[in-house]
């Protein structure tokens, strides 16, 4: 026995390190088995709360749609025009995608909602047999320099590609989404810029309330019976306005609720504080969605606050711009240091890209503008985002979320700490 050891009071065993990696596609239906809801499955809109964390608001659910279940928390890749650029539908599933987001504004102008309807809806059009969601495109319209007029009944604007005059209303958005045919339809809302003052935020919030009431009264008339419709809560980072708006929408005929108007230029701490304060107040029996957030830190904050769904263009847009995201940090693959680096992007990553291709090869493809680069880089980035979320989903269901969340916080710290090995590589 070692000198000084006490056999009656042995030192406690160190806590095992939490599992921070997983296959995000594990447990999901294979691509070949995706398709319309089976007769014995719950009706679209049914939400099963499978587990809730005792130390935070984090939860894991199963949302049923007309094209099968969505296991939450869930990250949704953005396929604005009906495709995630460069990636085949079956490849989306292979890296862990469950539900794809498209944009009703863009699809309404090109190729047009009736054209999408003619071929059988968005699922047949893009050959994606799993769940799909469409955003109204209101955010894109309000971002246009050619915006002509906003009033309480809708928005007049000129299209971004040919300058033709157009109008968007709560009714026109639902009519387009009925033709496009997603499983989840987002209503028209007014999203003000992040730097807006309180008066402007309230004006946008009140207008969104009027549009939400109109959409809720029309949805049963316009949308198909198995399409879900989500309301959108505005209010910026003003917690009083957010609470007020949530209360005004909670009783309307919606199948789920989203927090809009975040990640639009406001300080990140204010955004996270808004998530922490408001997400747990959203109806417990309906899915909770935060629109347009997508850094690893944002997703960790959202899941801890009880959010079920989120989307962002970061995985695909950053990939196209040469940014590869991993548990080690973010790589600028154009950097000359990767010219002779034959390691995978992340040796601990099990994605199809890291299993086969090196940093040097990906750099070579990117420098020469080879389309294969976009495909591979997007697949890798999506895998990271899905894995980051799936690890937390598994932990909530296992009951060890606190330990896993703490482990992921350490990962974030290691990725950003100056002088660290990870930071030196990226």
Which residues are covered by each model-predicted region?
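Active-site pocket-lining/capping segments in soluble small-molecule metabolic enzymes
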Residues: 128, 133-134, 138-145, 151-162, ...
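Non-catalytic, usually N-terminal nucleic-acid engagement modules in DNA/RNA processing proteins
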Residues: 14-223, 336-339
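Glycine-rich phosphate/ribose-binding loops and adjacent secondary-structure elements
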Residues: 20-21, 26, 33, 209, ...
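C-terminal extensions of enzymes
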Residues: 8, 14-64, 70-74, 86, ...
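Flexible, glycine/charged-enriched surface loops at secondary-structure junctions
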Residues: 221-226, 398-402
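Compositionally biased, low-complexity flexible segments
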Residues: 3-7
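Conserved, mostly hydrophobic/aromatic
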Residues: 68, 100, 135, 177, ...
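Glycine- and acidic
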Residues: 193-195, 202, 256-262, 371-374
